[in-house]
């Protein structure tokens, strides 16, 4: 039993099919006990009998193992190989593993046997799976090298096995560990026919959604904004333009052609001149004004109809020309040779009426054509500028001369048409027409064009539209010239070691900036802590870190360990260090510029080299298309569409050329700008999709399905157009400099926002404010406010900052003490702050105060609304009588000074207002007098000031009763007149200040006699003012706002503002 098994195993290993079959069939007991799925163990790499039978293609044993012994072809050995792997390897691959030498002499027979065994394995069905299907041989199983059975079959060149595997859904695109597909394996082993067959099946493989992708790509408009034209296309384009123009103008073809030629073949320009003055337009073009065609003439021609007999002479012949008739027979004479024109000669009619014999016509036209003046041939008569129609030229000259005339005519058509250029390549007779989209064009091709777009004549000749040189988009011609000049100056072929030199210069600069050399061995030393006594770790030299001199020269007299007082030596060392640093910086900057240039130049050359390599694909693309068509036609019966290969190569070359020229464009962009960042992002995106398409197309054998190549081509085309359109639009707007931030509260206003005509005027205004003369009493007032403020007497004043109820009296007499908050506010008072003055002026403008003391009707304070200051300024009603309150800056300043002085005195001694003082005439202003009191004006003033403060500062403002009212315990209504009792000391002090108060009131009344500042009125002023002010918020924290509001509130009869 054991001997039979051993002999059978050896026969299987050696590939002796006859001996193995004899042992297997002759011993029924051994046959019954044999397990084809049992492994022979680790010494035999865990191969099974089925593995060895498949390796040597033993047909009878494989059939018996699969269908009689329940053999499983999916069983793997130690290399993760199944029976299919070993079967498809072939004798070339298994040469060192058995007696396969005789099979080389019979390769066809061996391939046939392996195909039969493969077919049996593919027909095998195993156990029933969970999904209701039966287990089958896995044709896509991979071994340790990630190779499938199709890889081995393709490498062995077994065409029949490959076809069977492909029919059974073998994966054509799977790659092994060497990133090779089955097609690559066949090509590597020089099985070209098999590789071409696999390539065609890979390219034209159908997957779900592939047809939709191809149909979508076919429906796309892949036209470019230019069109290559042949000579026939140029003639057809010219004829169509003439016919369409003649139809629009209702003119003969010859007239329409002459008009177009005179207007550079621009129909829009012609129509504009035609609509302006048609007769003058025809006169400048050398043609007569078209008239309705007479009977017997064609509508679109100038030649007479064949049905109409020819007249003896033109009806428009002048009297002078009538004398040229022959006196004998009445025949016309030729105006050139003076010979009689025979009646049997074909007529040459001109609209001008001049007649010449046919021989003279032919000689004249031949001479003009030979001279190259084919587009402007006038009548040969003296001082006649009538153009000769094309029909006349074609009917007179010979056929050869007519062809030459047509060539000159087409050349003149192209030369005079700014939308058409000839191809600059030698011996190329093609032209290019460029279509520039107009503004708001709805055509899908109406993306913006570059200044110097690249065009193609149709033969692959790319050139710049502007300079007719090599195509260089997205660069314009000037940028391209600058780049070429830069390359010639830098000589990059001589800059091989720029990167290394740049790194050395950067290291040298860092060492000079962060270290010092040893005074003995010049080794760089970096100090991070400690005293000035340094010891070189290399040469053990002791020196001073400051002056780099020997440490022996230092002692306590030179500053000790942490100072060095040797001035001359230190200065010398610093100068040397500075010179070395400056030199290193220059060197580093120079190498930095060189390194930057090499960065762009290297990538420029890389794309240029790739373009040269991929340009060869144009020659092989057509051959590849024919080969794929022939290889795939046997299966489908109809040749497939292979134009996608050529389209992909063309798109790849276009994009590669743009990427090549994009680096010169990026080189001249402003460094670290938004435009450059966006441009480089788009450039990187375009490079990624271009390289992906290159990997799919630039291969000896394509390994990508057609729909994926089509999708990649379309994606590259879309990215390319977006890239060029973005560059044409400017990529991104230029980076604008940061605008100066305006400061409002507590600071200065911009001159334009304040209404000044220029910054100089605003500066002059500020200068006048700072240097104005002080009035009598100002210095005393400021001195008393800032220096002589008495201290609080008791602790009860510390609570003066708390808010009181609205019903508390605000008109109690003031004592000589102030709360701490009032003292701080008065001490920080800044009378030069222009913000408070601006607020007063705006309030006066809105109030509309007049010169006369009569009250004016005004609405509630717009300052209480939530609108901003500019909107409130715009909402001021325009009246026919402008208000007097719009005072100048100097008047407003003087008024502010007077109010401040008046407010300081009045707020400290008595709750009065300026209307309670006598004016210059001795009359007194009473608050209850309707002729001089406007409560809405006062409320509007304070409301606008509070609204302005709220707009300038996000925090809020709280107005509370002043601390002066804290001393009183009685409660009075806010709107009642002030009737507080004064002590004798207060009366005496009041009398001493009466002169100063009168002077302040007089100044204020002189500058603004119509100003009333009185919050007290009979119309419940407490309710009005508090309601208006509480709408604006509750507190502020800015120092400037606190000073302004406090200074105004302090003078506003019993109100003050404090910081909470």
UniProtKB/Swiss-Prot annotation:
The keyword Zinc applies. Zn(2+) 1 binds at residues 334, 337, 357, 360. Its EC number is 2.3.2.31. Signal peptide: none annotated. It holds the Pfam family IBR. Residues 304-319, 858-868 have a biased composition (Low complexity). Zn(2+) 5 binds at residues 544, 547, 554, 564. One of its GO terms (biological process) is protein ubiquitination. Zn(2+) 3 binds at residues 464, 467, 472, 477. Residues 330-568 are annotated as: TRIAD supradomain. The active site is at 531. Belongs to the RBR family. Might act as an E3 ubiquitin-protein ligase, or as part of E3 complex, which accepts ubiquitin from specific E2 ubiquitin-conjugating enzymes and then transfers it to substrates. This is Ankyrin repeat and IBR domain-containing protein 1. It comes from Danio rerio.
């Amino acid at each position: 039993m054991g001997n039979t098994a051993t002999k059978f195993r050896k026969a299987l290993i050696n590939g002796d099919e006859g001996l193995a079959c004899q042992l297997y069939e002759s011993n029924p007991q051994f046959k019954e006990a044999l397990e084809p799925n049992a492994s022979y163990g680790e010494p035999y790499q865990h191969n099974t009998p089925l593995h060895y039978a498949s390796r040597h293609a033993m047909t009878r044993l494989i059939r018996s193992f699969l269908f009689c012994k329940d053999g499983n072809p999916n069983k793997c050995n130690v290399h993760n190989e199944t029976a299919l792997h070993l079967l498809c390897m072939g004798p070339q691959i298994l040469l060192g593993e058995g007696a396969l030498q005789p099979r080389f002499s019979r390769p066809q027979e061996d391939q046939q046997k392996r195909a039969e065994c493969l077919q049996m394995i593919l027909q095998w069905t195993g156990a029933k799976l969970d999904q209701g299907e039966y287990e089958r041989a896995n044709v896509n199983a991979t071994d340790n090298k990630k190779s499938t059975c199709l890889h081995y079959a393709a490498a062995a060149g077994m065409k029949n096995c490959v076809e069977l595997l492909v029919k059974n859904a073998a994966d054509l695109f799977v790659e092994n560990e060497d990133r090779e597909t089955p097609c690559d394996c066949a090509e590597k082993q020089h099985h070209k026919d098999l590789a071409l067959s696999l390539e065609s099946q890979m390219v034209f493989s159908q997957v779900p959604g592939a047809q939709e992708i191809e149909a979508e790509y076919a429906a796309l408009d892949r036209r470019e904004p230019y069109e290559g034209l042949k000579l026939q296309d140029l003639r057809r384009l010219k004829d169509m333009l003439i016919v369409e123009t003649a139809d629009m103008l209702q003119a003969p073809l010859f007239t329409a052609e002459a008009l177009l030629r005179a207007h550079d073949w621009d129909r829009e320009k012609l129509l504009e001149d035609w609509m302006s003055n048609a007769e003058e337009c025809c006169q400048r073009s050398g043609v007569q004004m078209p008239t309705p065609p007479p009977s017997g003439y064609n509508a679109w021609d100038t030649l007479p109809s064949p049905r109409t007999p020819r007249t003896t002479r033109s009806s428009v012949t002048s009297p002078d020309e009538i004398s040229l008739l022959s006196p004998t027979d009445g025949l016309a004479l030729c105006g050139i040779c003076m010979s009689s024109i025979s009646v049997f000669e074909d007529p040459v009619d001109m609209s001008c009426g001049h007649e010449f014999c046919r021989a003279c016509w032919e000689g004249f036209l031949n001479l003009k054509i030979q001279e190259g003046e084919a587009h402007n041939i006038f009548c040969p008569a003296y001082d006649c500028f009538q153009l000769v129609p094309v029909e006349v030229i074609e009917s007179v000259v010979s056929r050869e001369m007519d062809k030459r005339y047509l060539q000159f005519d087409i050349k003149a058509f192209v030369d005079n048409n700014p939308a058409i250029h000839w191809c600059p390549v030698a011996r190329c007779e093609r032209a290019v027409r460029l279509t520039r989209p107009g503004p708001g064009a709805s055509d899908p091709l109406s993306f913006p064009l570059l200044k110097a777009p690249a065009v193609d004549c149709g033969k692959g000749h790319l050139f710049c539209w502007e300079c007719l040189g090599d195509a260089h988009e997205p660069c314009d011609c000037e940028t391209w010239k600058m780049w070429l000049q830069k390359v010639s100056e830098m000589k990059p072929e001589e800059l091989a070691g720029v990167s290394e030199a740049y790194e050395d210069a950067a290291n040298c600069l860092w060492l000079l900036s962060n270290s010092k050399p040893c005074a003995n061995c010049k080794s760089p030393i970096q100090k991070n802590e400690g005293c000035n006594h340094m010891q070189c770790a290399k040469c053990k030299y002791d020196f001073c870190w400051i002056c780099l001199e020997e440490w022996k020269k230092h002692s306590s007299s030179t500053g000790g360990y942490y100072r060095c007082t040797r001035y001359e030596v230190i200065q010398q060392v610093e100068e040397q260090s500075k010179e070395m640093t400056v030199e290193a910086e220059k060197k580093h900057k120079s190498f930095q510029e060189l390194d930057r240039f090499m960065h762009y130049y290297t990538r420029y050359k890389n794309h240029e080299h790739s373009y040269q390599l991929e340009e060869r694909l144009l020659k092989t693309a057509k051959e590849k298309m024919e080969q794929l068509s022939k290889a795939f036609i046997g299966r489908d019966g109809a040749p497939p569409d292979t134009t996608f290969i050529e389209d992909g190569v063309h798109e790849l070359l276009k994009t590669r050329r743009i990427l090549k020229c994009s680096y010169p464009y990026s080189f001249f962009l402003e460094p670290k700008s938004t435009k450059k960042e966006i441009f480089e992002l788009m450039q990187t995106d375009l490079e990624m999709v271009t390289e992906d398409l290159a990997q799919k197309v630039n291969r000896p054998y394509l390994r990508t399905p057609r729909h994926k190549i089509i999708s990649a081509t379309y994606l590259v085309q879309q990215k390319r157009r977006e890239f060029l359109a973005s560059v044409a639009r400017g990529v991104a707007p230029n980076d604008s400099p940061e605008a100066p931030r305006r400061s409002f509260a507590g600071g200065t206003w911009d001159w334009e926002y304040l209404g000044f005509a220029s910054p100089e005027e605003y500066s002059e205004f500020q200068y006048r404010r700072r240097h104005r003369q002080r009035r009598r009493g100002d210095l005393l007032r400021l001195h008393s406010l800032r220096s002589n403020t008495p201290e609080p007497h008791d602790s009860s004043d510390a609570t003066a900052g708390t808010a009181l109820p609205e019903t508390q009296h605000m008109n109690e007499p003031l004592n000589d003490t102030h709360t701490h908050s009032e003292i701080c506010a008065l001490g920080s008072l800044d009378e030069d702050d222009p913000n408070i003055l601006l607020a007063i002026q705006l309030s006066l403008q809105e109030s509309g105060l007049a010169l006369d003391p009569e009250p004016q009707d005004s609405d509630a304070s717009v300052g209480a609304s939530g609108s901003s200051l500019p909107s409130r300024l715009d909402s001021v009603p325009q009246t026919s009588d402008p208000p007097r309150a719009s005072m100048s800056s100097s008047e407003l300043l003087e008024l502010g000074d007077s109010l401040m002085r008046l407010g300081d005195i009045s707020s400290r001694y008595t709750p009065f207002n300026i209307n309670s003082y006598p004016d210059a005439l001795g009359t007194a202003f009473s608050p209850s007098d309707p002729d001089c009191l406007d409560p809405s004006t006062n409320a509007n003033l304070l409301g606008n000031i509070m609204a302005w403060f709220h707009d300038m500062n996000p925090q809020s403002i709280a107005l509370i009763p002043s601390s002066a009212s804290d001393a009183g315990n009685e409660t009075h209504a806010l709107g009642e007149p002030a009737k507080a009792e004064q002590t004798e000391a207060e009366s005496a002090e009041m009398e001493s200040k009466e002169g100063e108060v009168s002077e302040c009131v007089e100044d204020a009344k002189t500058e603004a006699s119509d100003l009333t500042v009185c919050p007290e009125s009979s119309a419940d002023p407490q309710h009005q003012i508090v309601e208006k002010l509480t709408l604006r918020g509750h507190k502020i924290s800015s120092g400037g706002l606190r000073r302004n509001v406090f200074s105004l509130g302090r003078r506003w009869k019993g109100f003050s503002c404090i910081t909470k």
